[in-house]
Amino acid sequence: MRVTDVLKEYDLSKLTVATVASHSALQIVHGAKKEGLRTLLIVKKDRYEFYSSFSHLVDSFIIVESWKEVLNEDVVNELLASNAVLVPHGSFVEYVGAQGLLDYPVPIFGSRKILLWESDQKKKMELLRRAGIKVPREYRSPDEVDGLVIVKLGGAKGGKGYFLAKTPEEVRRGLEALGNPSNYIIQEYVIGVPAYYHFFYSPIYNRLEITGMDIRYESNVDGLRRLPPELASGIRPSFTVVGNIPVVLRESLLIDVYKYGKSFVRTTEELLGEELVGPFCLESIITEEGEVVVFEFSGRIVAGTNLYVNGSPYSYLYWDEPMSAGRRVAREIRKARDSGRLEEVLR
């Protein structure tokens, strides 16, 4: 069913922002409430006690035994009856699946197709290259490896399963330990400092906004830094994201970051045939020469935005009021509804 047909059946005065209770869900419902919209969380039974403690932010819950139940007809019907707009995030994509979201009958805020590209490491890097964004060298097979590399799995896994290697044999052993996955890439490991840039593209305001940035706090690689070299030697680093740290970039670097964001939005529309709407993230390493090298993107809200529930230094420059990424999503939805332009932001 097309979004146009679904919206004809909706009571737009009771439009409801809905998402899966994980990742950035609390920020999303908090932002929706700030913009006067109704809220709904799909929550696993074993998580209900925690999320129900925020019942002042959530108008209704749909309780499920497993995330795959999100695709069930009874859940879909309840969402449609609630006039729901789904806001996808990393857990939504990982647990439900980008393919499942592609044909989902409930309106989704933002682009559906970008979630498919995000889940495929090779397509992801192709999009970045086509956008003219500087990316690390990529190796087509373990045999080509001739220096330090990072091997990365596809999907929104929060860095789980990533590993470092220096030789073809180390890459093969690492892949074998992971069950020889098919969706992976081998990238040059760029030396520098990480920085992850949060963007929001708005069709309603016709502009790209930088809404914040962060650094990921990863286990065990960040813990290894506390050990003396003689003790850390021989311990294999891993990159499972457990939290986020705020960062403000040198203002001169923002110019290149903004150019990358603009190019990403333009290229996404050219390749996917639909406009990118709402939050996305470019994930980078900045070298000692000040070069921004982008190694990943996320085509939806990222968990790093949870740092800025009361707004970031950058979002305040646009709005002069507290504006989280979750509230920014809700404002775009509300403004689109009030101006009769919902079809421009929903897919």
Curated annotation (Swiss-Prot):
UniProt cofactor note: Binds 1 Mg(2+) or Mn(2+) ion per subunit.
Protein name per its UniProtKB record: 5-formaminoimidazole-4-carboxamide-1-(beta)-D-ribofuranosyl 5'-monophosphate synthetase
Superkingdom classification of source: Archaea
Molecular function terms, GO-annotated: ATP binding; ligase activity, forming carbon-nitrogen bonds; magnesium ion binding
Listed GO biological process terms: 'de novo' IMP biosynthetic process
Residues reported in the UniProt entry to bind ATP: 142-196, 218
Binding-site residues, 5-amino-1-(5-phospho-beta-D-ribosyl)imidazole-4-carboxamide: 23, 91, 244
Entry keyword Manganese: yes
Pathway(s) of this molecule: Purine metabolism; IMP biosynthesis via de novo pathway; 5-formamido-1-(5-phospho-D-ribosyl)imidazole-4-carboxamide from 5-amino-1-(5-phospho-D-ribosyl)imidazole-4-carboxamide (formate route): step 1/1
Mitochondrion is among the record's keywords: no
Coiled-coil blocks: none
InterPro entries, per database record: ATP_grasp_subdomain_1, IMP_biosynth_PurP, IMP_biosynth_PurP_C, IMP_biosynth_PurP_N, PreATP-grasp_dom_sf
UniProt KW keywords: ATP-binding, Ligase, Magnesium, Manganese, Metal-binding, Nucleotide-binding, Purine biosynthesis
Catalysed reactions, semicolon-separated: 5-amino-1-(5-phospho-beta-D-ribosyl)imidazole-4-carboxamide + formate + ATP = 5-formamido-1-(5-phospho-D-ribosyl)imidazole-4-carboxamide + ADP + phosphate
Highest classification ranks of the organism: Archaea, Thermoproteota, Thermoprotei, Desulfurococcales, Desulfurococcaceae
Record EC number: 6.3.4.23
Cofactor: Mg(2+); Mn(2+)
Top EC class for this record: ligase
Species this protein is from: Ignicoccus hospitalis (strain KIN4/I / DSM 18386 / JCM 14125)
